[in-house]
Amino acid sequence: MAEEPQRSPAPTSPFAFTVPSNPLSDLPDIPSDRPVLIAGPTASGKSALAARLVEDGGGVVVNADALQVYDCWRLLSARPSAAEEAALPHRLYGHVGARQTYSAGHWLKEVAAVLAEGLRPVIVGGTGLYFSALTEGLAEIPHTPPEVRAEADARLAEAGLARMVAELDAETAARIDLQNPARVQRAWEVLRATGRGLARWQAETAPPLLPLSDATALVIRPDPAWLAQRIDSRFDLMMADGALDEVRATLPGWDPALPSARAIGAPELVAHLRGEIPLDEAIAAAKLASRQYAKRQRTWFRNRMRLWHEIRLP
């Protein structure tokens, strides 16, 4: 691994949530040159854990969250603060424009470049698809033509999610999160554009960039009630820190169809700024959406990360 510069202790952002110390004493021994993967639901303290590991043992914090890549979302995505990013090496945070598309394939290529730097990676985030692509490989699925994407957008809007699910092949429907409109639409587009189900394409996956056996993989499994309280408290802190202004800055080019528009809380606060709902209703809806997202994350991690070392919280 490459030699690292000395650095000062990392500061803490106004809305950063720490991880209780006791569960961390149960961590496995991690060699200083071994890659670390940290997955966990939103507001579970995974970013604080990643920063602590890099501060104590060296390396670079690498983002594995699909929304923290966008430059327009620092507060709503709970991206590390500018001071935190300056205090420790960070990669793949806030480097993608709001109107750009960004997929697991884009992320995987950029992670490959980070691994080539030679610093020990501590890869942290809540996007399960990124971790599975990294440790299991990612199928080379053809790009969706714009006309198929437009057809899918119209189909979802007119017929609804349930109808789109019914039109998927059985093998794919059994493997993806059918409650996630983005995942369902992507699978529908692949089938429509190629005539083959997403599951068939995934069966031809290339070897993984970082096999699970070559890393220390940690998954945070928090108590749901404890996590729900943290989610609500963190959103209040985000609002106090300027999240509404952050959303206001995106209004001129706001497009709900963009991947960046999936940031939890953004659609709700946009609705308020457009005079459609009062602020307290927008905040309540954003908190609910965040808790629902955390539940979907916990389900993914429980089903797909059974070989990962568990960190039970609190």
UniProtKB/Swiss-Prot annotation:
GO terms for molecular function: ATP binding; tRNA dimethylallyltransferase activity. Monomer. The record marks T127, R149 as: Interaction with substrate tRNA. InterPro entries: Dimethylallyltransferase (IPR039657), IPT (IPR018022), P-loop_NTPase (IPR027417). This is tRNA dimethylallyltransferase. It catalyses: adenosine(37) in tRNA + dimethylallyl diphosphate = N(6)-dimethylallyladenosine(37) in tRNA + diphosphate. The gene is miaA. It holds the Pfam family IPPT. Its cofactor is Mg(2+). Belongs to the IPP transferase family. Substrate binds at T42, A43, S44, G45, K46, S47. It comes from the Bacteria. GO terms for biological process: tRNA modification. ATP binds at G40, P41, T42, A43, S44, G45, K46, S47. The keyword tRNA processing applies. Catalyzes the transfer of a dimethylallyl group onto the adenine at position 37 in tRNAs that read codons beginning with uridine, leading to the formation of N6-(dimethylallyl)adenosine (i(6)A). Residues 1-24 are annotated as: Disordered. Its EC number is 2.5.1.75. Keywords: ATP-binding, Magnesium, Nucleotide-binding, Transferase, tRNA processing.
